[in-house]
């Protein structure tokens, strides 16, 4: 933890930002990875190659991890990928998993607009339990420094199986 705090202090002093805690991704202001922004902002994306994932807003698919199966499938037209249709709860859980780890966090307005008020109520309820680990401002929830150490636990608490 000492190393984490030292690095965080150093980067902040240089006016860099830690925009994704998962990989300790740090950058200068507004120089974020465009590739990763698509995941974090729940945008559509296409993955090409073995193990690549794609998302079209409704379904998620992923290619086989085996190179020879992928190449053979592409060349012959055989299936080399799996597809799953996401329900609302699964889309919400993906949103939590990707956004909570970023500097932008969970946005109440986005949640209300894309998932409904029942999800907003559940997020509010769980947020109270972890208020010592979260920062709540501008209708957004982000992790404070202590919260970053238990990010997985907090994210799993927000996961919803069914709110109805």
Put a short name on every predicted segment:
Residues 1-117, 163:
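C-terminal scaffold of the Radical SAM
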Residues 29-31, 139-142:
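Self-splicing inteins and homing endonuclease
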Residues 143-147:
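Basic, amphipathic "hinge/linker" alpha-helix immediately C-terminal to the N-terminal HTH DNA-binding motif
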Residues 148-164:
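Short, amphipathic alpha-helical interaction segments positioned at domain boundaries
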